[in-house]
């Protein structure tokens, strides 16, 4: 598994194979090898802990000459910065032969890459500090039983948090959480507007899109109906221009439209011309959904019709969408009964026109057989929103109901691009990285408080364990779980060593799970009311990733690396 991870290094070619004597092979029985493997993660820990909890990180991007500032609230950009760091280490090693013989650097890069693959998108101060602390304890006692104790401790914490996670439903509690997560009142007000538009039902990260706006204030646009997982046909520039998509970026039709579903690839213009003529006379637009492609004379006729109607001030347009079986739960058009019902096709799946089997070409004469209807559409080349006033409960099958939802687009305003980018990243992180996961699966107290609450149970687990070395592993977990809180209290509040220890002891002794002190001279506060929460699913995935990495590294007895050639320059 380690070798597979190490071979994913772009276009650089391997100079040596495993069979040669020149390939660096390291035995993990030598603890210094494992310590070198951990060195890259320690560097990452310093970066993450110094830029977490209201801190900022200054870095120079790969393609920019000026330093950039990344806030601790912008976890997505922080993750990208770490990926750039890993890429730079790989490139430096491939282009510098001296670095290839530098064992600590090579192993540090290997460990860092493996850690990033295990932890995935849960790169936090918690994941790095736990990993470094637990492995340092393992290096002192490199026994399998110690690893078992570490795994038992981490699994106990995961079970404890799963049983005690907090479900937040009250709008007041959600608003308090938003106030805590945002940096300004304008950000919190925009987020509250979005939540109100979807009735505080933010259970997925694809419900709200946060984009750069072109005004000085924020705008909220709500798209209701069926979220169609494919956009307007984009294979022909002339067709896109006929819909004015390159300039307007969006096709929005708020009047009743005809709907025609076509099974197969539409090439022959004679199959669509009767529909074009019928729609032009009705001055209605047509939503044409093809299970294949639309090309040749048929697409040319559609383009000419759109341009002609635009010149004549006729509102009729032909909007072509491609049907994706994969994006519709692997259902063929004839099998997607919920979608057929939503489009109000008059004869169900018999209304899907097939040039091979249907006796009549769709036209005015057989309109009651083929044409459905929708009330409005908003579409780009990436996705579309179809709206019909239909009761969601009337749709029998449960799986496609995920397409029936309100989707909100929040356009971020500001006085310059820097302000807009900063606010967009922060708000997007708050909505789609924190709130959506927490509202869907539950919250736990933030600032590492939830890990402190598990300490009494870990002590009991340790006391009941008969094996001494397993106890050592559990004790390593007990020592590690206080580190995230130490970082949080120091960075967020600037407390000294004694104040931090006092707060940690108070959180451990407080029996109520959501209660904790955030100031040495104050009473315990409810983290739900105060808004100091974080998503349970994120912490659970973080602990699972740490456990996976530790198990992978401690169960491996050999690390095989590669020597890479410099990339050859191709002559023009």
Curated annotation (Swiss-Prot):
Its main location: mitochondrion. GO terms for molecular function: ATP binding; ATP-dependent protein folding chaperone; protein-folding chaperone binding; unfolded protein binding. Residues 489-572 are mitochondrial intermembrane. One of its GO terms (cellular component) is mitochondrion. The chain crosses the membrane at residues 472-488. It is a single-pass membrane protein. Residues 17-471 are mitochondrial matrix. Belongs to the chaperonin (HSP60) family. Chaperone. Required for the assembly of succinate dehydrogenase subunits. Ensures mitochondrial gene expression at elevated temperatures and prevents heat-aggregation of the ribosomal subunit VAR1. This is Mitochondrial chaperone TCM62. It comes from Saccharomyces cerevisiae (strain ATCC 204508 / S288c). The gene is TCM62.
């Amino acid at each position: 598994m380690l070798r597979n991870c190490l071979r994913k290094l772009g276009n650089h070619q391997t100079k040596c194979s495993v069979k040669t004597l020149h390939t660096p092979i390291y035995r993990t029985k030598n603890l210094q090898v494992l310590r070198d493997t951990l060195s890259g993660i320690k560097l990452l820990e310093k970066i993450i802990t110094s830029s977490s909890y209201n801190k900022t990180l200054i870095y120079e991007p790969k393609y920019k000459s000026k330093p950039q500032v990344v806030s601790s609230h912008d976890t997505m950009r922080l993750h990208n910065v770490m990926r750039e760091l890993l890429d730079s280490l790989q490139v430096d090693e491939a282009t510098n032969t001296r670095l290839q013989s530098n064992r600590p650097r090579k192993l540090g890069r290997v460990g860092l890459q493996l850690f990033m693959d295990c932890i995935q998108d849960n790169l936090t101060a918690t994941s790095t500090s736990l990993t470094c602390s637990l492995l340092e304890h393992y290096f002192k006692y490199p026994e399998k039983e110690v690893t078992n104790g570490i795994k038992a401790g981490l699994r106990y914490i995961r079970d404890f948090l799963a049983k005690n996670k907090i479900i937040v439903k009250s709008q007041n509690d959600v608003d308090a959480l938003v106030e805590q997560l945002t940096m300004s009142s304008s950000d919190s007000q925009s987020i509250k507007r979005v939540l109100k538009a979807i009735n505080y039902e933010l259970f997925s990260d694809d419900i709200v899109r946060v984009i750069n706006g072109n005004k000085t204030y924020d705008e909220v646009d709500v798209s209701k109906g069926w979220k169609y997982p494919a956009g307007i046909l984009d294979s022909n520039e002339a067709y896109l221009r006929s819909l004015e998509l390159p300039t307007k970026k969006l096709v929005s039709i708020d009047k009743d439209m005809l709907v025609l579903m076509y099974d197969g690839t539409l090439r022959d213009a004679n199959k669509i011309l009767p529909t074009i003529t019928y729609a032009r006379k009705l001055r209605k637009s047509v939503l044409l959904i093809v299970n294949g492609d639309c090309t040749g004379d048929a697409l040319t006729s559609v383009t000419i019709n759109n341009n002609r109607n635009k010149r004549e001030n006729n509102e009729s347009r032909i909007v072509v969408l491609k049907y994706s079986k994969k994006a519709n739960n692997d259902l063929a058009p004839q099998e997607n009964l919920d979608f057929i019902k939503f489009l109000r096709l008059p004869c169900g799946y018999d209304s899907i026109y097939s040039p091979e089997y249907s006796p009549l070409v769709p036209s005015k004469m057989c309109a009651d057989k083929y044409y459905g209807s929708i009330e409005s559409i908003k579409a780009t080349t990436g996705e579309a929103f179809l709206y019909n006033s239909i009761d969601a409960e009337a749709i029998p099958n449960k799986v496609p109901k995920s397409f029936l939802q309100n989707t909100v687009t929040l356009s971020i305003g500001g006085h310059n691009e820097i302000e807009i980018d900063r606010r967009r990243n922060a708000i997007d992180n708050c909505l789609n990285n924190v709130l959506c996961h927490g509202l869907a699966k539950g919250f736990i107290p933030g600032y590492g408080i939830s890990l402190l609450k598990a300490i009494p149970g870990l002590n009991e687990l340790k006391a009941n364990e008969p094996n001494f070395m397993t106890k050592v592993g559990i004790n390593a977990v007990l020592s590690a779980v206080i580190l995230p809180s130490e970082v949080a209290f120091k960075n967020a509040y600037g407390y000294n060593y004694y104040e931090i220890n006092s707060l940690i002891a108070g959180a451990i002794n407080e029996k109520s799970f959501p209660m904790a002190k955030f100031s040495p001279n104050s009473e315990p506060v409810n983290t739900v009311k105060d808004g100091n929460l974080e998503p349970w699913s994120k912490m659970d995935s973080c602990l699972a990733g740490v456990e996976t990495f530790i198990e992978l590294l401690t169960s491996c007895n050999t690390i095989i690396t590669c020597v890479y050639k410099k990339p050859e320059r191709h002559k023009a």
